[in-house]
Swiss-Prot record:
InterPro entries registered for this protein in UniProt: KdpA (IPR004623)
Lineage: Bacteria, Bacillati, Bacillota, Bacilli, Bacillales
Membrane found in the keyword field: yes
Compartment(s) where it occurs, according to its Swiss-Prot or TrEMBL record: Cell membrane
Protein family (similarity comment): Belongs to the KdpA family.
Role this protein plays: Part of the high-affinity ATP-driven potassium transport (or Kdp) system, which catalyzes the hydrolysis of ATP coupled with the electrogenic transport of potassium into the cytoplasm. This subunit binds the extracellular potassium ions and delivers the ions to the membrane domain of KdpB through an intramembrane tunnel.
Designated name of the protein: Potassium-transporting ATPase potassium-binding subunit
Amino acid sequence: MIWVAVVITMLLFILVAKPTGIYLEKTFQGSKKLDKVFGPFEKLIFKITGVKEYNQTWKQYALSLVLLNGFMIVVVYFIFRLQGVLPLNPAHIEGMEPTLAFNTAISFMADTNLQHYSGENGLSYLSQLIGITFLMFAAPATTLALVMAFIRGLAGKELGNFFVDFTRALTRVFLPITFMAALVFVALGVPQTLDGAVTAQTIDGAKQSILRGPVASFVSIKELGNNGGGFFGANSTHPFENPGQMSNILQMMLMMLLPTALPFTYGRMVGNKKQGRILFVSLFMVFLLGFITITTSELNGNPALNGMGIEHVQGSTEGKEVRFGTVFSSLYATVTTAAETGAVNTMHDTLTPIGGLVPLVNMMLNTVYGGVGAGFVNIIMYAIIAVFISGLMVGRTPEFLGKKIEGKEMKLIAVTILFHPLLILGFSALALSTSLGTDAISHSGFHGLTQVVYEYTSSAANNGSGFEGLADNTPFWNITTGLVMFLGRYFSLITMLAVAASLKEKTVVPETVGTFRTDNSLFGGIFIGTIVIVGALTFFPMLVLGPIAEFLTLK
């Protein structure tokens, strides 16, 4: 029965992807029906804020994005610092320490949601609503806007206006869907209230304080926006965030909804629907491989315990919730790192070595399917690399969407693809070379190395999940992961927007018999191979020293 439920869940991922992709295309390309519904409200917003609806250059688009995001980071930073004297603080929580406020503000603006604090004890209701939830909408709206400009550039069209795209992402995508999802979560038992904690009496007569809050609205945008941060410290293992299997499946659907839809949106916007389908199918195969790997490893249990003759019919149950079970915990771990969300319904630090390797690889690749917008930019980056390598092998000038890929584009892509591993491995080396970093490690040996690398991988990929055995709420970890999140977020977005702007100016080369097609299974295979060879092998030495070595030790 459990496998039937898994198959149904997978089918739901597939069935909703195309309709959502079509809706996104109509949202950002213009639709008379949608304009009638949302247009008056959006024009009012533009009038109040003084936004002019004109086409921007790629530099203007990128500058608008960075300035708006930077302003939001500063505002929310001061909310966190001053929450102790601000209203809506029934628990009388003190203001955040400076480096923690710095880390948290960047974390949520970068759509990472790395949390070096415990949600229910670290933030007031005002900080949760005005600070955290506000950024949970703004962050994915930023990248959804940018990816639309990116696709327009690839299609040879004007990039559009960042503020217009940003507003439409909020009014036409995130607000309507999260409103409906929040109502469903409330029906499934997720609380939604501004009242303070409830004091309950336990069976043995002791008193227990049960924290609650506006959780349903928080969870809906947490998952849809690929944010991942928890209202509670336990994240989606907490019964108030994720009461049962229905809420668990709904959360996974929300996480996958936009990332899986974007290949179809892309196909329609560039006039090559078949290429969009090829990208979707290719990435789904990689996703399935990851799920099969982690599930097999977790069901086989811990090799060290198996050798002692301990029963493991349910697999490795350490760190997992009984109400979800091993299989759905494995699926959730695959989804949350494939979609770069970072929400967890099981403790990733307790996964088996190979089980923990899958989330780590998903984040290192950052393409299967990646987070809202940012992940799809990486997908196209790998697609262009695949075309470039194929062109070199047959002695032809590489072409993508009928436009020649030349030195300028490849230099930008080369810098972008190297920057991700440089952030992860460079900062990991820094942490391992100083006691400021190593003092946080709770396990010596191979697992300790994995804890460190996982933290920086999660930060660079804007995922936010963690091996929570790492004691990371220190100035060193707050500052370094904050820098990694900021750089990992904005560097690749800006460089790839420059690539799209460069391709926009090029003329379309007529297709010939010798043109390498990017809408067939051959390209799909080369695309997957490029991801594995260029992406995975970059990190292979680290994976050998970390989870693979730990696995061999346990065996």
